[in-house]
Amino acid sequence: MANAEVSVPVGDVVVVPTEGNEGENPEDTKTQVILQLQPVQQGIYEAGSENSAAVVAVETHSIHKIEEGIDASSIEGNEDMEIAYPITCGESKAVLLWKKFVCPGINVKCVKFNDQLISPKHFVHLAGKSTLKDWKRAIRLGGIMLRKMMDSGQIDFYQHDKVCSNTCRSTKFDLLISSARAPVPGQQTSVVQTPTSADGNITQIAISEESMEEAGLEWNSALTAAVTMATEEGIKKESEEISEDTLMFWKGIADVGLMEEVVCNIQKEMEELLRGVQQRLIQAPFQVTDAAVLNNVANTFGLMDAVKRVLDNRRKQVEQGEEQFLYTLADLERQLEEQKKQAQDPRLKSQTVQNVVLMPVSTPKPPKRPRLQRPASTTVLSPSPVQQPQFTVISPITITPVGQSFSMGNIPVATLSQGSSPVTVHTLPSGPQLFRYATVVSSAKSNSPDTVTIHPSSSLALLSSTSMQDGSSLGNMATMVSPMELVAMESGLTSAIQAVESTSEDGQTIIEIDPAPDSEADDTEGKAVILETGLRTEEKVVAEMEEHQHQVHNVEIVVLED
């Protein structure tokens, strides 16, 4: 074909003889190319109808005569003939080779750019439009987006009916009629006008008829164009009134006897379309094209209310399930907290037992020795630290236990005899010792006037003393007051203890301590201690001892010095 570059798919190339050239050879006539099947302005259609155009199209291009031996049906089968579309993307220009443009086309090397065969995606990247997600919108054919050209049916993938990836559905509902099959050359073509839309656009379809003897028509998927929308957005059924043109259109189809076949074809196309959507949902994520198709179908057939009802029912079910889920979750959390508490109790018990077992046993501290407290009015004579003092008890004094045992173990006892009165010397070890004695008063009227008996009942603190000189027997002992305190004296001194019960009205007891020995005392007699008593022989305790502090009250201690 000389200078013949067809810029449309082969299936849309039609050779149509005009009425004025019926007697001539059809091959000598000019041909017209159908680029698209979409609404056209009514003025254009009227001009075309006045010229008795056999084929209605938006654009018609006159091409040179087809060379002898080559007809329209042989163009697709001829491998030597290449069909190309000039495309642009931004400032870049390239050529789309249609026979290499197969579904899905995005990564197929079908674009010739700078003598290189690249894919449309690569071409968009080289043109600097890679930020656009849709490559069909980035590529333009004659100033029109490639997606819009494919949605309107002006161009399609090569042999799309045989090779399809199921990911190439258009976003327009009128894609159902985009793959119209061209009429066979030599057939007469009649024009059927669809209803006029509100903006003045009309939709037209071409119906090829055979000879008058044959009443049948060859229908294919392109005949579903009778149900296309007047505009790209479609006409809502509930908002439009049925016009007279619409009524005449469908009445004409019914009069011809094609209503049943049209309905069957529409049903098949709808089933295939919806089945394809379901299959793509299984194979790949939901796509924008599927959403557009479903939206157009729902709006066309008034199914949006039904879809909303389904959504409401599902939302109620989800809310009920969510409430049940939250209740179950709260119950599980409560059970988990209880189990945690139960698990922590044995741990605490075991930890307590372990702490008790591992706790070091602390031995109780030995009790402190009671501190000896002396009256503040007394003069304390500290003993010599070199010589250990000893306690000497001079008999005749017998200690008889009353009420409790009294132990004098490990105490050296020396018995001395002088004259008729035995003297027993008890030597006590150094250090403070605590003895409890009872207050017992023995008068001169007793059987043994030289003996005083002391019973353990009260507190008597023996501090210190020195060794006593041997003395004679004690005479005229009448009274001895207890409790009494023996005060420590320095070593080498002869102590004279006199217990005298005063006959005065205040009844004080005076204990006189003479640190110096009696110079007039006879060495042979060895008088060391003189106990003088008054005239009164009745028992009178003036000194009081506190239980815990062991202090002597109301006792006056007088130290006599030379």
Curated annotation (Swiss-Prot):
It comes from the Eukaryota. Zn(2+) binds at C103, H160, C164, C168. Keywords: Acetylation, Coiled coil, Cytoplasm, DNA-binding, Metal-binding, Nucleus, Transcription, Transcription regulation, Zinc. The modification N-acetylalanine is found at A2. Residues 311-355 form a coiled coil. Trans-acting factor that binds to glucocorticoid modulatory elements (GME) present in the TAT (tyrosine aminotransferase) promoter and increases sensitivity to low concentrations of glucocorticoids. Also binds to the transferrin receptor promoter. Homodimer, and heterodimer of GMEB1 and GMEB2. Interacts with TRIM63. Interacts with the glucocorticoid receptor (NR3C1) and NCOA2/TIF2. May interact with HSP27 and CREB-binding protein (CBP). This is Glucocorticoid modulatory element-binding protein 1. The lineage of its organism: Eukaryota, Metazoa, Chordata, Craniata, Vertebrata.
